[in-house]
């Protein structure tokens, strides 16, 4: 299926990307499933942190799951990613497990 991005991208000194995106229903459902799992992990982490089961700092990523899912859609598993914190979803996106 082809999806058209209605608002054009603004680019500076580069060619703007296409406003047409090719995808499939299964790819969209997979992205939603990944984002949903990431959100559930963040909510569970919040509960554990507030229950004092996680010590130190717990920087949560809820509300940003689509960033990680979109990034993973554009990258390959061979591409390197560097994070400093709020990396629970990156762990899942790279193929890690919630446990």
Question: What role is predicted for each listed range?
Answer:
Residues 1-67:
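Conserved acidic/glycine
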